[in-house]
Amino acid sequence: MEITKDDAIKARDFIWKNSKILGQASADRSYLEAFLKSKLALLMAESTETTMAGKEMYAKSHPDYIALLHGIKEAQNQEVTLKWQMDSAKITIEIYRTESANNRAIDKSM
């Protein structure tokens, strides 16, 4: 399968269009991971349990904490998916560059 100039341009445009989205996805994941610690502390403080283990069990089984974990999972999925799509676009461009250089070398030798 030969990669055309149009394919390389589409790959470049994809990277350009999605770079900000990837940055936001990464920031969202980082924020949620940091907030998870705060949420754990808030829920532990809210607990009526007397032991630390009891407070932690209450907090980690709380629906808000579980919802936050699901949010982190979704944010990480979005980030990783975009990262691999970006890597694929970069590889497409590199293959096009290599094929173009090879074709120029063949043309010179003829």
Predicted regions and their residues:
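Short acidic DE-rich linear segments
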Residues: E2-I3, A105-M110
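Extended alpha-helical coiled-coil "stalk/arm" regions
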Residues: A27-M57
